[in-house]
Amino acid sequence: MGAELVKWVKSHKIDAHIITFVAKMPYIDSIKLLEAGAKGCVWKTSHPAKLNRAIDSISNGYTYFDSVHMDCEKISSRYSSDNQLTNRESEILQLIADGKTNKEIANFLQLSRKTVETHRLNIMKKLDVHSGIELIKTALRMGVCTI
């Protein structure tokens, strides 16, 4: 809902600098808000002084990220249009996050194991991760899976 509202405001050329208040949400949802055009993120539970800082920063032409969102810029670069996962890559990432092996994924999707391995390498490259553990951590941040 939040990202759609931000997009609506931007599509109607309303001159507004949008700060989003977020509760507990996966990083991918925060990133969707930012990609939609929000200028900052502040947690609902943050001290009111952080909102004042956000307003000051944004009114001076900067963006503002609550300290818990500091990874948003780093992570959002992983989801730029150049790095967007394909539907197949997203599907494979979900299966990896579910604990499936390359062989199990290949059987399930009726692909060769080599094709799955290639998709996995492409996913890791796009997400700028270098190990299976980093891949799972990123999947958690994206909201692909939960603990």
Curated annotation (Swiss-Prot):
<dbReference type="Pfam" id="PF00196">
    <property type="entry name" value="GerE"/>
</dbReference>
<dbReference type="InterPro" id="IPR011006">
    <property type="entry name" value="CheY-like_superfamily"/>
</dbReference>
<protein>
    <recommendedName>
        <fullName>Uncharacterized response regulatory protein YgeK</fullName>
    </recommendedName>
</protein>
<keyword id="KW-0805">Transcription regulation</keyword>
<keyword id="KW-0238">DNA-binding</keyword>
<dbReference type="InterPro" id="IPR000792">
    <property type="entry name" value="Tscrpt_reg_LuxR_C"/>
</dbReference>
<dbReference type="GO" id="GO:0000160">
    <property type="term" value="P:phosphorelay signal transduction system"/>
</dbReference>
<feature type="DNA-binding region" description="H-T-H motif">
    <location>
        <begin position="102"/>
        <end position="121"/>
    </location>
</feature>
<keyword id="KW-0804">Transcription</keyword>
<feature type="domain" description="Response regulatory">
    <location>
        <begin position="1"/>
        <end position="59"/>
    </location>
</feature>
<dbReference type="GO" id="GO:0003677">
    <property type="term" value="F:DNA binding"/>
</dbReference>
<dbReference type="GO" id="GO:0006355">
    <property type="term" value="P:regulation of DNA-templated transcription"/>
</dbReference>
<dbReference type="InterPro" id="IPR016032">
    <property type="entry name" value="Sig_transdc_resp-reg_C-effctor"/>
</dbReference>
<dbReference type="InterPro" id="IPR001789">
    <property type="entry name" value="Sig_transdc_resp-reg_receiver"/>
</dbReference>
<feature type="domain" description="HTH luxR-type">
    <location>
        <begin position="78"/>
        <end position="143"/>
    </location>
</feature>
<keyword id="KW-0597">Phosphoprotein</keyword>
